[in-house]
Amino acid sequence: MYSLLETELKNPVGPPTPAAGTGVPAAPGAAGKSGANPAGGANAGNGGSGGANGGGGGGGGGGSDQDRVKRPMNAFMVWSRGQRRKMALENPKMHNSEISKRLGADWKLLTDAEKRPFIDEAKRLRAVHMKEYPDYKYRPRRKTKTLLKKDKYSLPGGLLPPGAAAAAAAAAAAAAASSPVGVGQRLDTYTHVNGWANGAYSLVQEQLGYAQPPSMSSPPPPPALPQMHRYDMAGLQYSPMMPPGAQSYMNAAAAAAAASGYGGMAPSAAAAAAAAYGQQPATAAAAAAAAAAMSLGPMGSVVKSEPSSPPPAIASHSQRACLGDLRDMISMYLPPGGDAADAASPLPGGRLHGVHQHYQGAGTAVNGTVPLTHI
């Protein structure tokens, strides 16, 4: 074993052979780097070979490749020189990189006793190298291939002419700086998220706006705050099937709302509404609620009445038509002969009479609002 190593290592700095390269044609002075990749992986778990390779360097003070000083071989390189030649002779078509992979795997399978002679030889070569080149320092070459790859896979802006990307960026910055409403335009593009087209939401807000009475001297509210509308409570009609207590409570609430100006009524109309509900047992409560609501003052202007109130003549005509439809709907569910039994039976006739009185009183008291009889 040692005789074979001595014959192979007589000229460790001699010209390299093509088999000692790492997959590419070896340049002069590149034999020191042969098999370096598997050697690094193999020496990572081997303390002796790592120590043997610790003082290596890759470049001397010379400027050309011929004057460059090679690094001393480590234990793996010493072992792989003979093995690489043997494997290349056995498999002439095998690529050099595949040979290096197999050599690295075989080196890891060796035991420490089998690696010991190669580790000792690597230490001896390192000591000789340090004596010959005491001022040697490893200076790695610049990797030009990686830089070329980075330039090759650059951003798509590299496809443009040299000054096109910078000119486009400058034009975009100038346009953004000269536009004072750039932020507003960007915000307008997000109005589609809520289902409104650009500017449609503001148009709806303008249509829903209302004019305050001229008696109001307070300044208008800020436009940023959303306008909250309240609707006329007296316009909501309730079923006559409700118990008397609930009807009196709702009638009192409607009278209080009307007296406070929520429906846009005058105080005299509010008094008339309170008088219209005088037959209910909650007259005192309604009067107290109306007196308390009158103290609200200008808060009534915040409330919006129904905008679709028809004139009184049309309201009375539609009211009669709705009452006729309601009579037909109720008669559908009465037993056969219900029309003849209306006069004899007090219950259905009284019920319809109560419906007539309820809707007539509510319609005359509340600003001509159409009752919601279709509900």
Curated annotation (Swiss-Prot):
Predominant place of localization: nucleus
**UniProt cross-references to CDD domains, sorted A to Z:** HMG-box_SoxB
Motif 9aaTAD mapped to chain: 325-336
Q: Where is the composition biased (Low complexity)?
A: 19-41
Amino acid composition bias (Gly residues), ranges on this chain: 42-64
Question: What's in the keyword line of the UniProt record?
Answer: Developmental protein, DNA-binding, Nucleus, Transcription, Transcription regulation
Annotated compartments? Nucleus
Its name, as the record gives it, is: Transcription factor SOX-3
This chain's source organism reads Mus musculus
Q: Name one GO molecular function term.
A: DNA binding
